[in-house]
């Protein structure tokens, strides 16, 4: 286990469960949010730091992943946010990078997410 906390931000409960299963042995604590608004509040409340990771979906009801990433990074510049999405598109990758994401992984490649977390 790596000494980090993971915050999973995903509106689909089954996908949240799948992501949790893939990364569960890599973190000392895992929490979940269903939208970007919850994620911004949870990041501050849990006092997450540079050693921790946020796994953020892009499209969610209410505040989406890009806006939540911008808000978290504005308040916490050291926040490490990895986008986990179904969109394999340069537009989304560029937008995620501009919002402050440090990584971008497709949901179909969750083993790549594990490698990214291990190699942090």
What are these regions (language model features)?
Residues 10:
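Conserved acidic carboxylate
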Residues 32-53:
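Acidic, metal-coordinating helix/loop segments flanking the phosphotransfer/catalytic sites
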Residues 60:
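Receiver (REC) domain active-site loop signature in two-component systems and cognate sites
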Residues 35-38, 63-67:
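Acidic catalytic/metal-coordinating carboxylates
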Residues 57, 85:
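Active-site residues of response regulator receiver
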């Amino acid at each position: 286990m790596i000494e980090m906390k993971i915050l999973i931000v995903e509106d689909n409960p089954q996908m949240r469960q799948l992501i949790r299963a893939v990364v569960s042995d890599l973190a000392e604590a895992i929490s979940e949010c269903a939208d970007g608004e919850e994620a911004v509040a949870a990041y501050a409340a849990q006092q997450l730091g540079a050693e921790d990771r946020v796994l953020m979906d892009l499209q969610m009801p209410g505040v989406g992943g890009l806006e939540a990433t911008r808000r978290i990074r504005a308040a916490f510049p050291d926040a490490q946010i990895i986008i986990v999405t179904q969109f394999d598109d340069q537009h989304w990758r560029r937008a995620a990078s501009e919002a402050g994401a440090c990584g971008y992984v497709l949901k179909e490649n969750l083993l790549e997410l594990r490698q990214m977390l291990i190699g942090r």
